[in-house]
Amino acid sequence: MRPSGRNNDQLRNLKVTHNFTKHAEGSVLIEFGDTKVICTASVVAGVPKFKKDSGEGWLTAEYGMLPRSTHTRMDREAARGKQSGRTQEIQRLIGRALRASVDLTAIGENTIKVDCDVIQADGGTRTASITGASLAIADAIEYMKQNGILDEQANPLLSQVAAISVGIYNNEPVLDLDYDEDSNAETDMNVVMNSNGGIIEIQGTAEGKDFSEEEFAKMLGLAKKGIKEIFATVF
């Protein structure tokens, strides 16, 4: 039995609020159960130096957690003077996943800057960030079309992207782990897929106990099922 009482293949309650903030070109509040993340996509003219005069745009992502998004308060990383390795790893994951969904040549020499800010954490913050950011990017691209930054016929989105966590909890594969499950899981895996059914990234780690190829296949099957439900629900 899962602590939440959910079935092994059951997602948490999923809710998306578009235009959650008024300044960003795209903004979404995404909620997976008690995990809540604000995802914004900001459009900035110009590109980094390594993209200058390439005719291509760029997309980058930042990730952070509010000090009391967790059970006990943690210091802001800005106050500590540097980002943790975990934060840097998650930012890179989010950026890779989202760049796989956008035709950078189609946005011209513009940059889309994604910010994912966790306001409440209960497991699955990185996967929620990817899903919410994909929705925010779609809204930002629509803004670019409506405001003459892009031609109305432009279609920079190659696909949408969603992500979910799966794992082995009490010797059983489960979908969409909350904090209680994640902190006690024998295996934790994050899966990122696009709306065409393609796999973008898989991160899987055994926590003190290995997992079999059969268990891996079961977890991947759960992830595919969950992501399909996410696309059907919020995209």
Swiss-Prot record:
User: Matching CDD domains, A to Z?
Assistant: RNase_PH_bact
* Record field: catalytic activity: tRNA(n+1) + phosphate = tRNA(n) + a ribonucleoside 5'-diphosphate
Q: Which GO terms describe its molecular function?
A: 3'-5'-RNA exonuclease activity; tRNA binding; tRNA nucleotidyltransferase activity
Question: In this record, what's one Pfam family?
Answer: RNase_PH_C
What are the record keywords, sorted? Nucleotidyltransferase, RNA-binding, rRNA processing, Transferase, tRNA processing, tRNA-binding
The GO biological-process annotations, alphabetized, read as: rRNA catabolic process; rRNA processing; tRNA processing
**E.C. number, please?**
2.7.7.56
Residues that coordinate or bind phosphate? R86, G124, T125, R126
Q: Which family does it belong to?
A: Belongs to the RNase PH family.
Question: What is the role of the protein in this entry?
Answer: Phosphorolytic 3'-5' exoribonuclease that plays an important role in tRNA 3'-end maturation. Removes nucleotide residues following the 3'-CCA terminus of tRNAs; can also add nucleotides to the ends of RNA molecules by using nucleoside diphosphates as substrates, but this may not be physiologically important. Probably plays a role in initiation of 16S rRNA degradation (leading to ribosome degradation) during starvation.
Its subunit composition reads: Homohexameric ring arranged as a trimer of dimers.
Among NCBIfam families, the record links this protein to:
RNasePH (TIGR01966)
- The protein's name is Ribonuclease PH
Query: What organism is recorded for this protein?
Result: Francisella tularensis subsp. holarctica (strain LVS)
